[in-house]
C-alpha cells in the first residue's frame, strides 16, 4: 500500500511539473507575441506624419509613394505586429499608460510635462514641411495689422526666446530675424487698435506673449485667444472673429481648407516642433528593434 501511495505521489509530481512548464512556456509565448500598441494622431496630416516617423524608426514600412496623406492602410510591412491606435492629438499624452508607445506633437508633449528632447525615444528632424505658421483669411495678407504681427513674430527677440525657452524641442525657422517692425506699416494708424490671434496654449501662446511686448511698444494690443483643438482656431479666422491664428503647419491647413471649404492662407513660417515617439508601457525601443 505504501509503495502504491509513493507511485501515485510521484505521478502527480511529474504531472504537476509538466503542467507548470507548459504554463510557463505559454506565458513566454504570450509575452513574445503581445501586440504592440502605438497611439498616433487621428487627423489626416498628423497621422501621416506619425506613420512616416515610425517608418524612419524602422518599426513599419509604408507602400511606395505614401507621403503626407498616408494612413495605416498604407502599411505594407509590420515586422513587430504593431497595432496603430488613432486618437485626438491633444488626448494622446493621457493614453501613455494604456499603450506601448505614442507619437506626440511637441506642443502637446510639453503641455503634458514631457521634454521632447530628453523624454522622446525617437524624434524627427526639423522638416520645413511641418513648420508652424501664422495664418490669416485670404485677402487679409497685406493688411497693416497682419504685417505688424508677422514682423513681431519674425523678430530676433522671438527667435531668442524660442531657442532659450525650449532648448531644441521647438526650433525657430526664421532665417533672418529682424527688430520686430516692418517699415512699410503705418504704426501710427494702428495705435490703440487690437489684433486678435487664436493659438494653442503651448508653445504658440507663450511665443505670442513676446510678440505682444513688441506690439505694445507701438501701443497696439495683441489679444491672444487659446484653444486646445485643431478646428476652432481656423473657424474663428474664417468667420472674422480673429485676425489670425498660430497653431498649425501647412499640410494640415491645406487639408482643412479642402475639407471645410475655408479660405485661410499662410503668411509666415515661425517655428517647427519635431514630432516624437514616447514610451508608454514600454520604456525602451527594444520591443520594436528585434531585441
Could you tell me what each predicted segment is?
Residues 18-22:
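C-terminal motif of bacterial Sec signal peptides marking the signal peptidase cleavage site
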Residues 29-47, 51-53, 57, 155-160, ...:
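A conserved helix-loop-strand patch within extracytoplasmic ligand-binding domains
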Residues 34-39, 190-202, 220-226, 291:
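Short, well-ordered beta-strand elements
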Residues 50-51, 55, 145, 153-174:
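Periplasmic-binding protein-like
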Residues 66-94, 224-235:
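Short helix-initiation/N-cap motifs at beta->coil->alpha
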Residues 88-89, 97-100, 104-110, 201-202, ...:
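Beta->alpha turn/N-cap motifs
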Residues 98, 111-123, 255-267, 282:
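Ligand-binding "clamshell"
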Residues 130-148, 274-288:
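A bilobed periplasmic-binding-protein/Venus flytrap-type ligand-binding module shared by bacterial periplasmic
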Amino acid at each position: 500500500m505504501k509503495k502504491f501511495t509513493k507511485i501515485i505521489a510521484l505521478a502527480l509530481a511529474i504531472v504537476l511539473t509538466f503542467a507548470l512548464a507548459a504554463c510557463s512556456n505559454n506565458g513566454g509565448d504570450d509575452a513574445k507575441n503581445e501586440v504592440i500598441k502605438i497611439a498616433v494622431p487621428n487627423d489626416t496630416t498628423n497621422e501621416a506624419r506619425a506613420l512616416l516617423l515610425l517608418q524612419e524608426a524602422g518599426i513599419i514600412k509604408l507602400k511606395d509613394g505614401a507621403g503626407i496623406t498616408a494612413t495605416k492602410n498604407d502599411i505594407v510591412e509590420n515586422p513587430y505586429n504593431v497595432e496603430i491606435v488613432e486618437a485626438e492629438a491633444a488626448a494622446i499624452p493621457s493614453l501613455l499608460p494604456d499603450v506601448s508607445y505614442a507619437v506626440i506633437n511637441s506642443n502637446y508633449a510639453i503641455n503634458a510635462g514631457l521634454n521632447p528632447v530628453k523624454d522622446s525615444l525617437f524624434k524627427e528632424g526639423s522638416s520645413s514641411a511641418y513648420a508652424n505658421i501664422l495664418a490669416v483669411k485670404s485677402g487679409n495678407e497685406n493688411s497693416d495689422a497682419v504685417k505688424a504681427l508677422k514682423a513681431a513674430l519674425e523678430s530676433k527677440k522671438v527667435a531668442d526666446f524660442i531657442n532659450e525657452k525650449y532648448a531644441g524641442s521647438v526650433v525657430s525657422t526664421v532665417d533672418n530675424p529682424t527688430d520686430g517692425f516692418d517699415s512699410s506699416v503705418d504704426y501710427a494708424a494702428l495705435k490703440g487698435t487690437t489684433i486678435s490671434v487664436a493659438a494653442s496654449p503651448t508653445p504658440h501662446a507663450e511665443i505670442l506673449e513676446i510678440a505682444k511686448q513688441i506690439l505694445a511698444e507701438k501701443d497696439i494690443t495683441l489679444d491672444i485667444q487659446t484653444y486646445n483643438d485643431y478646428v476652432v482656431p481656423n473657424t474663428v479666422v474664417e468667420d472674422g472673429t480673429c485676425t489670425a491664428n498660430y497653431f498649425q503647419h501647412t499640410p494640415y491647413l491645406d487639408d482643412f481648407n479642402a475639407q471645410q471649404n475655408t479660405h485661410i492662407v499662410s503668411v509666415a513660417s515661425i517655428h517647427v516642433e519635431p514630432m516624437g515617439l514616447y514610451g508608454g508601457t514600454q520604456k525602451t525601443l527594444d520591443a520594436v528593434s528585434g531585441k
